[in-house]
A protein has these predicted regions:
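Large intracellular
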Residues: 4, 15-142, 214-252
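Membrane-entry signal-anchor segments at the cytosolic-membrane interface
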Residues: 1-7
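Helix-termination/interfacial motifs at the ends of transmembrane alpha-helices
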Residues: 7-10, 14-27, 134-210
């Protein structure tokens, strides 16, 4: 479980609830089933209209990764890659064959297989770079679906509020019913804004952020196997890979 997602969701909902309670309100008052049906499914379906079907499927397939902690550790991966580089340097590329059989990472297995086959640096790049680009495109489309749903949700909330007000104003002869209708109308607005900024939007941006980790790992692997094909010294190669994950924030 990605603890940051849990902290964000629980923390934001708790913060709003505490504020409402301090003002003498009831947070449960916004739990209006009709408003939910009008806003959230409509926003998600509108996003389906705006998103290519392949990416809609990807958005739901990769949804679990929003909440799951990805098993990606750049330092550990670099150490592993350098171990392979040392094997290549000392024993030759064919010595990697026995290691490849035990690798579960498909991209890494493909990359090392090309090294074993004697592929040149240019051939490796031509073969693996399109995979990285397509992976990036795949996750961009999947995350964009949730982001688009989040962008649509507040507007759909306003639509729901307008419908609610129309229904409420048709009951001028029944003040209690009209008041209830107006209250219900405003829950649609809250549902739309809350759904956007607490759930749908953050889900999309979280998936996008995790996709960056996947892409960065693939870039590290590509750089490593290109170095092996060139015959780079393991120490030199490790320095290059480490620089790829070293942030240097601007200090004014």
């Amino acid at each position: 479980m990605d603890i940051s997602v849990l902290i964000g969701l629980i923390g934001s909902l708790s913060s709003i609830s505490i504020g409402v309670i301090l003002e003498g309100g009831n947070p449960a008052a916004v739990l209006h089933i009709a408003s939910f049906i009008i806003v959230i499914p409509t926003a998600m379906l509108a996003a389906v209209t705006a998103t290519e079907a392949h990416f809609v499927k990807a958005a739901f397939k990769e949804f679990k990764f929003i909440f799951k902690k990805l098993p990606i550790n750049f330092e550990t991966r670099i150490d592993e890659l350098i171990e392979y580089a040392i094997v290549v340097k000392k024993q030759g590329v064919l010595a990697l064959e026995k290691d490849i059989q035990n690798i579960n990472h498909e991209f890494l297995k493909e990359a090392l297989s090309m090294v074993v086959d004697g592929s040149k640096e240019e051939q490796i790049e031509e073969s693996l770079e399109p995979i990285i680009e397509e992976t990036e495109h795949y996750y961009h489309g999947a995350s964009h679906y949730w982001i688009h749903a989040g962008e649509t949700s507040p507007t759909i909330g306003l639509v729901g509020a307008v419908f609610g007000l129309i229904g409420a104003l048709q009951q001028l002869d029944n003040p209690p019913a009209m008041a209830a209708g107006i209250a219900g109308a405003f829950t649609a607005t809250v549902m739309g804004i809350g759904g956007s900024y607490l759930f749908l939007g953050p889900w999309g941006f979280k998936l996008k952020a995790k996709a960056h980790l996947v892409i960065k790992e693939q870039q590290l692997i590509l750089a490593a196997v290109k170095g092996m094909a060139r015959g780079d010294a393991p120490g030199e190669l490790k320095l290059k890979l480490t620089k790829m994950i070293t942030a240097m924030p601007f200090r004014g």
